[in-house]
From Swiss-Prot:
<dbReference type="GO" id="GO:0046872">
    <property type="term" value="F:metal ion binding"/>
</dbReference>
<feature type="binding site">
    <location>
        <position position="320"/>
    </location>
    <ligand>
        <name>[4Fe-4S] cluster</name>
    </ligand>
</feature>
<comment type="subunit">
    <text>Component of the 2-(3-amino-3-carboxypropyl)histidine synthase complex composed of DPH1, DPH2, DPH3 and a NADH-dependent reductase, predominantly CBR1.</text>
</comment>
<feature type="region of interest" description="Disordered">
    <location>
        <begin position="565"/>
        <end position="585"/>
    </location>
</feature>
<keyword id="KW-0479">Metal-binding</keyword>
<feature type="region of interest" description="Disordered">
    <location>
        <begin position="1"/>
        <end position="37"/>
    </location>
</feature>
<feature type="compositionally biased region" description="Polar residues">
    <location>
        <begin position="13"/>
        <end position="33"/>
    </location>
</feature>
<dbReference type="GO" id="GO:0090560">
    <property type="term" value="F:2-(3-amino-3-carboxypropyl)histidine synthase activity"/>
</dbReference>
<keyword id="KW-0949">S-adenosyl-L-methionine</keyword>
<dbReference type="Pfam" id="PF01866">
    <property type="entry name" value="Diphthamide_syn"/>
</dbReference>
<comment type="function">
    <text>Catalyzes the first step of diphthamide biosynthesis, a post-translational modification of histidine which occurs in elongation factor 2. DPH1 and DPH2 transfer a 3-amino-3-carboxypropyl (ACP) group from S-adenosyl-L-methionine (SAM) to a histidine residue, the reaction is assisted by a reduction system comprising DPH3 and a NADH-dependent reductase, predominantly CBR1.</text>
</comment>
<dbReference type="GO" id="GO:0120513">
    <property type="term" value="C:2-(3-amino-3-carboxypropyl)histidine synthase complex"/>
</dbReference>
<protein>
    <recommendedName>
        <fullName>2-(3-amino-3-carboxypropyl)histidine synthase subunit 1</fullName>
        <ecNumber>2.5.1.108</ecNumber>
    </recommendedName>
</protein>
<keyword id="KW-0808">Transferase</keyword>
<dbReference type="InterPro" id="IPR042265">
    <property type="entry name" value="DPH1/DPH2_3"/>
</dbReference>
<feature type="region of interest" description="Disordered">
    <location>
        <begin position="521"/>
        <end position="547"/>
    </location>
</feature>
<feature type="binding site">
    <location>
        <position position="123"/>
    </location>
    <ligand>
        <name>[4Fe-4S] cluster</name>
    </ligand>
</feature>
């Protein structure tokens, strides 16, 4: 079900079998134990949901395809008896900030404050500033609950702002472009039968030439069940989580497209005779002309995965946090959202899986590429420059593994005096700064031999001009605000700007990443070749190193509960894994309810007998 401002999702509203809302009551007259009923303490009252004035205000002020959850917001403000409410949202939603403020002040007794500072993500929730302004409640729009509500300084309500899109067009776009057979997908979409290592077989040069085939014959061939289903991983921003779940269900069932363009989910109808594009020989089709592309409809089911990296929602990715996928299982990543910032995160974490982006606003579907080798080289160079400022360490240019120099440092005191200091930047924009990360970084620098002098610096936003004011006194900087600042903009700074992970690599707390390796970015061309002494070609690019963390890939796990080390804010917060064969909490709850249901039916059966 699509949700919008006129028809908000009533996830906490109880309904009767006929669809009418009603109060839920528990019958306590019976002494027979039965399944417990869920509490609905946060249910939005009917007088708010059905308020004609409120609904008219929402309809006239806010866009219908954006769900700002106004009813729930009004309910929570009234319930908390809030007197001053702070509204915080990213710049893309600021257009409606004044309208939301007017609605809140009209239908509650609270005043509002619009927080105009830049909001890059969920890490920027600014409850401390809101409290300093005298607000007793904060409504944060557009991001997930990265900072739990029980850890904020004042009462905080997160509104994801789910955006309604065209689900039929989204599913049809996938089926019209992606064969559901893995071999056909790799041949037609990736340009050959490409392995996870980046090697491919040659593509038939005659694939682009069209041949007339009879529709009945083509349908017989296309109707054959695939040997292996195309495996897609669906991800996106939090605004499109519902769209991701809907797409998953649509791709897990058969959908047929008739000659007139109509899409049905029933059994495949009898195809009319039609002209289709094919090859001049009996070889399988490798490329399809644009005119006949819509006829390459894949009506079968796909294998679909919606990955999750906790504490994020299933399918959700952040610019700094994305799941690590199995490159031998996943054939493609499908990202739903506009822009590349969040998509690049999962591309960096999974460089050997091709990525495609569906823009729900323009309805364009494109393949996105990323220069992994260049990024890794630049970040490796930044680590080496930082190491050179203190000496005693070097970085292997091929594997980026930190190792000791051959020259042994004898006079550690001299090195300690001549070594340049490092600046450790703690972000103060919202909740970006983490004292836990600062303590971990400071301890790593102090434990280094020789110890690296460092000074903590508090900054809300970084810029080359701001850090340039420190002159030559600091040789390198470590910033804990966002890893993407170092990855995307590190080259713009005069001194190395390391992320916490890169700092850990530089002081030998963890082995690093490989800079140039086979298969990065699923390149369509074979790996680079070089001539050996005998004139024979040999691979100049090494294979991935299984002995390195994440097989030598660059991690994107900054807010993951299962991150690599203590240089991330939530390291070690993942719950302990259950023993093999142990039941999950959900399974135990279902088992308990089943036992209660059986116990409640036993006396009735005995009385009847």
């Amino acid at each position: 079900m699509q949700s919008n401002a006129e028809n908000p999702r009533k996830r906490f509203t109880a309904t009767s079998p006929n669809g009418n809302r009603q109060n839920v009551s528990v019958d306590t007259s019976s002494n027979v134990a039965g399944p417990s009923r869920p509490r609905i303490a946060n249910a939005v009252p009917a007088e708010i949901l059905d308020d004609p004035a409120l609904n008219q205000a929402i309809k006239s002020i806010l866009p219908s395809n954006y769900n700002f959850e106004i009813h729930k917001t009004i309910h929570h403000i009234r319930k908390a008896s809030a007197s001053c409410v702070a509204l915080q949202m990213p710049e893309g939603l600021t257009l409606w900030a004044t309208g939301i403020a007017d609605i809140v002040e009209r239908f509650t007794d609270a005043t509002t404050v619009i927080m105009g500072d830049v909001t890059y993500g969920a890490c920027c929730v600014d409850d401390y500033t809101a409290m300093a302004l005298g607000c007793d409640m904060l409504v944060h729009y557009g991001h997930s609950c990265l900072v739990p509500v029980d850890q904020t300084a004042i009462k905080t309500l997160y509104v994801f702002v789910e955006i309604s899109i065209d689900p039929a067009h989204l599913a049809a776009t996938i089926r019209a472009n992606f064969p559901n057979d893995r071999h056909d997908f790799r041949a037609k979409i990736l340009g050959g039968s490409q392995s996870a290592a980046g090697k491919r077989s040659e593509v038939d040069e005659s694939a682009g030439r069209a041949q007339i085939q009879i529709g009945e014959q083509a349908s017989v061939a296309s109707g054959a069940p695939p040997s292996t289903l195309t495996h897609l991983a669906l991800v996106g921003t939090v605004q499109f989580i519902n769209a991701i779940n809907g797409l998953r269900e649509a791709l897990r069932q058969q959908q047929h497209r008739l000659a007139d363009g109509q899409i049905v989910s029933t059994e495949s109808p009898v195809d009319r005779l039609m002209l289709t594009a094919g090859t001049a020989s009996s070889a399988p089709v490798q490329h399809i002309t644009q005119a006949a592309k819509w006829k390459a409809w894949s009506s079968g089911e796909y294998k679909v995965t919606v990955p999750q990296v906790k504490p994020l929602s299933p399918g959700e990715v952040l610019g700094c946090t994305s799941p690590k996928l199995d490159k031998d299982e996943i054939d493609a990543i499908v990202y739903i959202g506009d822009g590349r910032f969040h998509l690049e995160s999962i591309m960096i974490a999974n460089p050997r899986i091709p990525a495609f982006r569906y823009d729900p606003y323009t309805k364009r579907f494109v393949r996105e590429l990323y220069d992994h080798a260049e990024m890794r080289r630049m970040r490796g160079e930044a680590v080496r420059l930082a190491q050179d400022s203190v000496g005693g360490l070097d970085l292997d240019p091929e594997t980026s593994i930190v190792k000791k120099n051959k020259a042994v440092v004898v006079d550690a005191e001299k090195d300690r005096v001549t070594a340049s200091g490092w600046g450790v930047l703690l972000g103060t924009l919202g909740r970006q700064g983490s004292l836990r990360v600062l303590e971990s970084l400071s301890a790593s620098l102090s434990e280094h031999v020789p110890p690296i002098p460092h000074v903590p610096i508090l900054l809300s936003e970084l810029s080359p001009q701001k850090l340039g004011l420190f002159g030559e006194h600091l040789a390198a900087f470590i910033q804990s605000s966002c890893p993407r600042l170092s990855i995307d903009w590190g080259s713009a700074f005069a001194k190395p700007l390391l992320s916490p992970y890169e700092a850990a690599v530089s002081v030998k707390k963890v082995k690093g990443w490989q800079e140039d390796v086979q298969g990065l970015g699923m390149s369509r061309t074979p790996a680079k070749q070089q001539q050996d002494g005998n004139g024979n070609g040999s691979d100049a690019v090494p294979a991935e190193d299984k002995h390195l963390p994440l097989d030598g890939d660059y991690p994107m796990d900054f807010y993951s509960d299962t991150s690599l080390g203590p240089w991330t804010p939530r390291h070690g917060m993942a719950p302990a894994k259950k023993p093999v064969g142990a039941k999950s909490n959900l399974a135990l709850l279902r088992s308990l309810r089943s036992k209660r249901a059986k116990a409640s039916s036993t006396p009735t059966s005995a009385a009847t007998a």
